[in-house]
Amino acid sequence: AELVDEEPLRTKAVRLIDQLMQHVVDNDFYLVDYDGEPTTWGKWNPEYVNARPKMVGDRKLNSSNIIAMLQTAYHFTGKDIYKEKAFELMHEHGYLDNLMRPMEEIGKAPDTADEWSKMLSESWDHSDDEMYYMGYWGLYRYAFNDTLKAKYRKAIIDHWEYERPEKEGLWNVFTSMVSNEFDLDEAIWFLQEHPLDLI
C-alpha cells in the first residue's frame, strides 16, 4: 500500500488489510472460513500457538507472523486495537519470547507431544521459511519502537545464519533490510542460476 501512487488503489489495499486483520481480531486470532470453522493454517490464538512445544517451529512462526500482521495493520490504519493486541500477545502470552527463540532450538516435538505438534515438526518445511521471511518486512519495518526493532533484527539475522548455506536469494535480500552483512554475491548467483522452469 505504501508503494501505490494511485489513491483509489491504495485506499482499497489499506481497507483489505484492515478488514482481514479486524476479522482475525474479532475471531479471537483465528481466520474463520465460510463454514464458521478456523482454517487449517489461520490459527494465531494463544491457546493454539502455545499448545505447541517450544521447539516446534510453528510456535515461533505463528507468533512472528501475527505480530508482523498487527504491526502492519496499525502502520496503515492507525487503529489502536492492533497495537494493543500485539502488545497483549507479546507480553501476556509470550509471543515476543516465541519469535525470539533461536533457530538452533527448533526441532522435533518430544514423544509426549500431541500428534499435531509431532506432524508439524516431522521435517523442515521450506514454505515455513517463506512465511517467516515474507512476514519479516512488516515485523521489522513497522516495529512499534526501536527496542523491538533491535530484537527483530537479531531474530532475522539468527534465521538467516541458519538458512545461509541454501544461498537463497530471497533470504539474502530480506536480510539486507536489517544488515549490511549478507551474501549479495550468493543472491545474484541464485537469481542467475535458478531454473526458470520452476517458476
Could you say what each language-model-derived stretch is?
Residues 3-35:
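A surface/extracellular/periplasmic glyco- and lipid-processing/surface-interacting theme
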Residues 22-64, 71-199:
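Ser/Thr/Asn(+Pro)-rich, low-complexity disordered segments
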